[in-house]
Structure formats: structure tokens, C-alpha cells
């Protein structure tokens, strides 16, 4: 059984036992989080929400909080000596999907 959930402005396909990276959640490590915005439930029969599947949720456990690798944003204007360099590290949360409830 799989589900497509909405978290952090993105849609993610998940299955039980899978470990995924999502945008940073306000939850402690080893705590349980519930994703209530389930768009599609798949398996033997597929349930498509309009826009959400009623009564469905995905339960997950927070494994760790971390930050992604640094990216460099560089702006410049040719021949004008205009240069701007900025770095960014996006925070994320790693979670393990425990169960999908329909």
C-alpha cells in the first residue's frame, strides 16, 4: 500500500517502512508526527481524494534534523563590477513512515 501526502508545499509518495526527507518539521527526535493531508491512497483499489482522502492519515517517526549541503548563489552584472555571493543551507527532517491508515 502506498500514499501520496502533502508536506512542506510538496507532494511525496510514501510506503510503510520507507525513510524520506521532508522540509523541517517542528517535532522532537523520536517523536511521532501525523500527516493528515493524504491526496491518494494506492494498493489493490486506488482512492483519489477531492482534494483529500477522508479519514486517511500517515504516521511517521522523526529520525533526525539536519541541513542540506551548501549551495552558492552568485549574481553579477558584466562590465559593471557588480558581484554578490551568498550561501544557503536548507534545513530538513528525516522521517520513517510507520503506517498508513485509511
Curated annotation (Swiss-Prot):
The keyword Ribosomal protein applies. Keywords: Ribonucleoprotein, Ribosomal protein, RNA-binding, rRNA-binding. GO terms for cellular component: cytoplasm; ribonucleoprotein complex; ribosome. The keyword RNA-binding applies. One of its GO terms (molecular function) is structural constituent of ribosome. InterPro entries: bL21-like (IPR028909), bL21-like_sf (IPR036164), Ribosomal_bL21 (IPR001787), Ribosomal_bL21_CS (IPR018258). Part of the 50S ribosomal subunit. Contacts protein L20. This is Large ribosomal subunit protein bL21. It comes from Exiguobacterium sibiricum (strain DSM 17290 / CCUG 55495 / CIP 109462 / JCM 13490 / 255-15).
Amino acid at each position: 500500500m502506498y500514499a501520496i501526502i502533502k508536506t512542506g508545499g510538496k507532494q511525496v509518495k510514501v510506503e510503510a517502512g520507507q525513510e524520506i526527507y521532508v522540509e523541517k518539521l517542528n517535532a522532537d527526535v523520536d517523536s511521532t508526527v501525523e500527516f493528515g493531508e493524504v491526496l491518494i491512497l494506492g494498493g489493490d483499489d486506488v482512492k483519489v481524494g477531492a482534494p483529500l482522502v477522508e479519514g486517511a492519515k500517515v504516521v511517521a517517526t522523526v529520525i533526525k534534523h539536519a541541513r542540506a549541503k551548501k549551495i552558492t548563489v552568485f549574481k553579477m552584472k558584466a562590465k559593471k563590477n557588480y558581484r554578490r555571493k551568498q550561501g544557503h543551507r536548507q534545513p530538513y527532517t528525516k522521517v520513517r513512515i510507520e503506517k498508513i491508515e485509511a
